[in-house]
Protein backbone atom coordinates (compact mmCIF):
# COMPACT_ATOMS: atom_id res chain seq x y z
CA UNK A 1 0.00 0.00 0.00
CA UNK A 2 1.75 3.17 -1.25
CA UNK A 3 1.01 6.21 0.90
CA UNK A 4 2.27 9.75 1.24
CA UNK A 5 3.96 10.79 4.46
CA UNK A 6 1.45 12.65 6.61
CA UNK A 7 1.17 14.66 9.82
CA UNK A 8 -1.77 15.23 12.16
CA UNK A 9 -1.86 17.74 14.99
CA UNK A 10 -3.05 15.86 18.08
CA UNK A 11 -3.06 18.85 20.36
CA UNK A 12 -1.23 21.78 21.85
CA UNK A 13 -0.68 23.45 25.18
CA UNK A 14 0.05 27.07 25.91
CA UNK A 15 0.10 30.24 23.87
CA UNK A 16 1.93 33.51 23.52
CA UNK A 17 0.20 34.58 26.74
CA UNK A 18 1.40 31.50 28.65
CA UNK A 19 4.95 32.11 27.40
CA UNK A 20 4.76 35.76 28.42
CA UNK A 21 3.44 34.87 31.89
CA UNK A 22 6.33 32.47 32.34
CA UNK A 23 8.74 35.29 31.58
CA UNK A 24 6.89 37.70 33.88
CA UNK A 25 7.16 35.27 36.81
CA UNK A 26 10.45 36.96 37.72
CA UNK A 27 8.50 40.17 38.45
CA UNK A 28 4.72 39.71 38.57
CA UNK A 29 2.45 37.27 36.76
CA UNK A 30 -0.64 39.40 37.31
CA UNK A 31 -2.18 40.16 33.93
CA UNK A 32 -3.75 43.50 33.15
CA UNK A 33 -5.06 44.82 29.86
CA UNK A 34 -1.94 46.97 29.62
CA UNK A 35 0.34 43.94 30.05
CA UNK A 36 -1.64 41.91 27.52
CA UNK A 37 -1.07 44.68 25.00
CA UNK A 38 2.67 44.33 25.59
CA UNK A 39 2.77 40.58 24.87
CA UNK A 40 3.71 40.87 21.16
CA UNK A 41 6.66 43.14 21.95
CA UNK A 42 7.76 40.99 24.90
CA UNK A 43 7.67 37.78 22.84
CA UNK A 44 9.76 39.40 20.13
CA UNK A 45 12.28 40.80 22.64
CA UNK A 46 12.66 37.47 24.44
CA UNK A 47 13.41 35.59 21.22
CA UNK A 48 15.58 38.32 19.73
CA UNK A 49 17.77 38.51 22.83
CA UNK A 50 18.07 34.75 23.35
CA UNK A 51 15.86 34.41 26.45
CA UNK A 52 14.36 31.14 25.21
CA UNK A 53 13.40 29.25 28.39
CA UNK A 54 9.84 30.70 28.55
CA UNK A 55 9.13 29.22 25.11
CA UNK A 56 9.43 25.75 26.64
CA UNK A 57 6.00 26.37 28.22
CA UNK A 58 4.30 26.00 24.84
CA UNK A 59 3.91 22.47 23.44
CA UNK A 60 2.79 21.03 20.10
CA UNK A 61 1.91 17.34 19.66
CA UNK A 62 1.80 15.44 16.35
CA UNK A 63 1.05 12.01 14.90
CA UNK A 64 3.39 11.32 11.99
CA UNK A 65 3.19 8.54 9.40
CA UNK A 66 6.48 8.43 7.55
CA UNK A 67 9.16 6.27 5.98
CA UNK A 68 11.88 4.85 8.22
CA UNK A 69 14.53 7.14 6.71
CA UNK A 70 12.52 10.20 7.76
CA UNK A 71 11.77 8.61 11.12
CA UNK A 72 15.53 8.47 11.72
CA UNK A 73 15.69 12.23 11.06
CA UNK A 74 13.00 12.69 13.72
CA UNK A 75 14.90 10.50 16.19
CA UNK A 76 18.03 12.61 15.85
CA UNK A 77 16.20 15.45 17.62
CA UNK A 78 16.74 14.29 21.18
CA UNK A 79 14.97 17.42 22.41
CA UNK A 80 11.65 16.07 21.12
CA UNK A 81 9.54 13.46 22.91
CA UNK A 82 8.90 10.53 20.59
CA UNK A 83 7.28 7.10 20.68
CA UNK A 84 6.83 4.99 17.57
CA UNK A 85 5.34 1.84 16.13
CA UNK A 86 7.85 -0.95 16.67
CA UNK A 87 8.53 -3.97 14.47
CA UNK A 88 10.31 -5.45 17.48
CA UNK A 89 7.09 -5.71 19.48
CA UNK A 90 4.48 -6.23 16.76
CA UNK A 91 4.20 -7.66 13.28
CA UNK A 92 3.85 -4.84 10.75
CA UNK A 93 0.95 -6.36 8.85
CA UNK A 94 -0.18 -3.42 6.72
CA UNK A 95 2.99 -3.10 4.60
CA UNK A 96 2.67 0.67 4.28
CA UNK A 97 5.30 2.08 1.94
CA UNK A 98 6.48 5.44 0.68
CA UNK A 99 7.70 5.98 -2.89
CA UNK A 100 9.50 9.29 -3.60
CA UNK A 101 7.21 11.54 -5.60
CA UNK A 102 10.08 12.87 -7.70
CA UNK A 103 11.28 9.43 -8.83
CA UNK A 104 10.99 8.69 -12.57
CA UNK A 105 8.09 6.29 -13.18
CA UNK A 106 10.46 3.45 -14.05
CA UNK A 107 12.18 3.70 -10.67
CA UNK A 108 8.91 4.12 -8.82
CA UNK A 109 7.85 0.74 -10.21
CA UNK A 110 11.20 -0.86 -9.44
CA UNK A 111 11.19 0.41 -5.86
CA UNK A 112 7.59 -0.72 -5.34
CA UNK A 113 8.37 -4.23 -6.63
CA UNK A 114 11.54 -4.38 -4.54
CA UNK A 115 9.55 -3.36 -1.46
CA UNK A 116 6.86 -5.95 -2.18
CA UNK A 117 9.53 -8.65 -2.32
CA UNK A 118 11.08 -7.47 0.94
CA UNK A 119 7.71 -7.33 2.70
CA UNK A 120 6.86 -10.81 1.48
CA UNK A 121 10.18 -12.13 2.80
CA UNK A 122 9.56 -10.34 6.11
CA UNK A 123 6.25 -12.13 6.67
CA UNK A 124 7.61 -15.46 5.38
CA UNK A 125 10.67 -15.26 7.62
CA UNK A 126 8.62 -14.32 10.67
CA UNK A 127 6.27 -17.26 10.20
CA UNK A 128 9.11 -19.70 9.49
CA UNK A 129 11.54 -18.93 12.31
CA UNK A 130 9.24 -18.25 15.24
CA UNK A 131 8.93 -21.97 16.01
CA UNK A 132 12.70 -22.21 16.42
CA UNK A 133 13.49 -18.78 17.87
CA UNK A 134 10.23 -17.88 19.57
CA UNK A 135 7.80 -15.15 18.57
CA UNK A 136 9.71 -12.32 20.30
CA UNK A 137 13.10 -13.01 18.69
CA UNK A 138 11.47 -13.82 15.34
CA UNK A 139 9.92 -10.33 15.20
CA UNK A 140 13.25 -8.77 16.11
CA UNK A 141 15.13 -10.66 13.40
CA UNK A 142 12.58 -10.65 10.57
CA UNK A 143 12.36 -6.85 10.57
CA UNK A 144 15.76 -6.66 8.87
CA UNK A 145 13.88 -7.44 5.66
CA UNK A 146 11.94 -4.17 5.96
CA UNK A 147 13.20 -1.42 3.67
CA UNK A 148 13.95 2.24 4.38
CA UNK A 149 10.76 3.25 2.59
CA UNK A 150 8.56 1.18 4.91
CA UNK A 151 6.25 3.51 6.82
CA UNK A 152 5.69 3.53 10.56
CA UNK A 153 3.69 5.78 12.84
CA UNK A 154 5.27 8.06 15.44
CA UNK A 155 3.84 10.16 18.26
CA UNK A 156 6.08 13.21 18.64
CA UNK A 157 5.86 16.40 20.67
CA UNK A 158 8.03 19.48 20.98
CA UNK A 159 8.08 22.44 23.27
CA UNK A 160 8.21 25.62 21.20
CA UNK A 161 11.91 26.12 21.82
CA UNK A 162 12.76 22.65 20.52
CA UNK A 163 10.21 22.96 17.71
CA UNK A 164 12.11 25.99 16.46
CA UNK A 165 15.35 23.99 16.52
CA UNK A 166 13.66 21.21 14.53
CA UNK A 167 12.34 23.65 11.93
CA UNK A 168 15.70 25.38 11.56
CA UNK A 169 17.35 22.08 10.68
CA UNK A 170 14.57 20.32 8.78
CA UNK A 171 12.61 23.09 7.06
CA UNK A 172 15.77 23.95 5.19
CA UNK A 173 17.02 23.72 1.63
CA UNK A 174 19.80 21.50 2.99
CA UNK A 175 17.39 18.95 4.49
CA UNK A 176 16.19 15.85 2.66
CA UNK A 177 12.96 16.44 0.72
CA UNK A 178 10.85 14.05 2.81
CA UNK A 179 11.74 15.41 6.25
CA UNK A 180 11.46 18.97 4.93
CA UNK A 181 7.93 18.20 3.79
CA UNK A 182 7.09 16.79 7.23
CA UNK A 183 8.49 19.91 8.93
CA UNK A 184 6.47 22.16 6.63
CA UNK A 185 3.30 20.18 7.34
CA UNK A 186 3.92 20.58 11.08
CA UNK A 187 4.47 24.32 10.80
CA UNK A 188 1.36 24.76 8.66
CA UNK A 189 -0.75 22.86 11.22
CA UNK A 190 0.52 25.06 14.05
CA UNK A 191 -0.21 28.20 12.02
CA UNK A 192 -3.76 26.93 11.45
CA UNK A 193 -4.62 26.25 15.12
CA UNK A 194 -7.89 28.01 15.90
CA UNK A 195 -7.23 31.37 17.48
CA UNK A 196 -3.58 31.35 16.34
CA UNK A 197 -2.24 30.99 19.93
CA UNK A 198 1.43 31.10 18.88
CA UNK A 199 1.07 33.96 16.38
CA UNK A 200 3.68 36.24 17.93
CA UNK A 201 6.09 33.40 18.70
CA UNK A 202 6.12 32.36 15.05
CA UNK A 203 6.46 35.98 13.98
CA UNK A 204 9.43 36.48 16.33
CA UNK A 205 11.14 33.45 14.76
CA UNK A 206 10.58 34.86 11.29
CA UNK A 207 11.87 38.31 12.23
CA UNK A 208 15.07 36.98 13.75
CA UNK A 209 15.68 34.65 10.81
CA UNK A 210 15.25 37.53 8.36
CA UNK A 211 17.18 39.99 10.57
CA UNK A 212 14.14 42.23 10.81
CA UNK A 213 14.62 43.06 14.50
CA UNK A 214 15.73 46.55 15.42
Where do the language-model regions lie?
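Family-specific signature for flavin-dependent thymidylate synthase
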Residues: 1-214
Amino acid sequence: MVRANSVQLLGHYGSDEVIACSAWTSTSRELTDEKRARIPKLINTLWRDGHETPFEKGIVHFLVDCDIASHIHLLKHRISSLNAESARYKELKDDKVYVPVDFPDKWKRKLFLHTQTSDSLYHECLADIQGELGRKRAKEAARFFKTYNSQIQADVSFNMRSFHNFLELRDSEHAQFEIRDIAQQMLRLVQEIEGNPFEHTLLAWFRKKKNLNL
